């Protein structure tokens, strides 16, 4: 169950970014990025839960947590930059 949720939220980030490439305007583009950001937060949650319940060890969790943090920061920067250009 947990791994299915992680897979769903993690792949949804990429799916929404792909959809953003074909957005019907800036508002739609930002919306897709904001959805991807929410999915990134959810992915971080599932990773933390898997780690805290002992399903994944720290040596697997830490790099994944760092990757999620980097993706989150990139998404936030992209959203803020796009909003500033409006």
PLM feature segments, named:
Residues 1-86:
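Short, C-terminally biased terminal segments at protein or domain edges
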């Amino acid at each position: 169950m947990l791994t299915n949720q992680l897979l769903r939220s993690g792949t949804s980030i990429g799916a929404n970014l792909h959809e953003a490439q074909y957005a019907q305007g800036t508002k739609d583009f930002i919306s897709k990025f904001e959805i991807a950001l929410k999915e990134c937060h959810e992915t971080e949650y599932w990773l933390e839960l898997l780690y805290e319940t002992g399903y994944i060890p720290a040596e697997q969790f830490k790099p994944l947590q760092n990757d999620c943090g980097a993706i989150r920061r990139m998404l936030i920067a992209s959203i803020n930059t796009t909003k500033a250009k409006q």
